[in-house]
């Protein structure tokens, strides 16, 4: 049996016209990096998040790295992260100079288990990187 890694064709089919139009407009503009499309995204996203600022980045690794650096997290600091996660979570922590501390997940959800976080916290712990998976949100209230 062959199981597709991340079949997003159904989502694409629902948005095909909008996606194709946006890509063509971007290509015709000649701006593939930064430019008005990114500015528009940043402005709209900041407004949607009710915050004055937004910076578009190239990847999730870049986003995690910049967030941690912006929080002053660096060498000597630990960041708790679920053991079941994609590599960008770990890479972002390492690029910020911190050490990832892998914590086991809940066997029913695959999400970070709040009951196991407390045991992993040390004097060097500066952050917990919660990873939401498969349409499920982590129990942030108990973290």
Residue ranges of predicted features:
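Solvent-exposed, non-membrane alpha-helical residues enriched in polar/charged side chains
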Residues: 20, 24, 28, 42-46, ...
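Phosphate-binding glycine-rich loop
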Residues: 31-78, 92-96, 102-104
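N-terminal "arm"/small-domain region of PLP-dependent enzymes with the aminotransferase-like
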Residues: 1-29
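Short alpha-helical
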Residues: 10, 14, 40, 62, ...
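PLP-dependent aminotransferase-like
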Residues: 69-143
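PLP-dependent aminotransferase class I/II
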Residues: 9, 38-43, 48-54, 115, ...
């Amino acid at each position: 049996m062959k199981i597709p890694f991340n079949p997003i064709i159904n989502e694409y089919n629902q948005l095909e016209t909008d996606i194709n139009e946006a890509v063509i407009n971007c290509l015709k503009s000649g701006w593939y990096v930064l430019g008005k499309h990114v500015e528009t995204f940043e402005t709209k996203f900041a407004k949607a998040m009710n915050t004055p600022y937004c910076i578009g980045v190239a990847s999730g690794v870049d986003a995690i790295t910049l967030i941690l650096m912006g929080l002053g997290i660096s060498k000597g600091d630990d960041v708790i992260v679920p053991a079941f996660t994609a590599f960008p979570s770990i890479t972002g922590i390492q690029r910020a100079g911190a050490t990832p501390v892998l914590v086991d997940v809940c066997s029913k959800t695959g999400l970070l288990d709040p009951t196991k976080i407390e045991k992993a916290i040390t004097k060097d712990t500066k952050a917990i990187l919660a990873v939401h998976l498969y349409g499920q949100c982590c129990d942030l209230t108990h973290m």
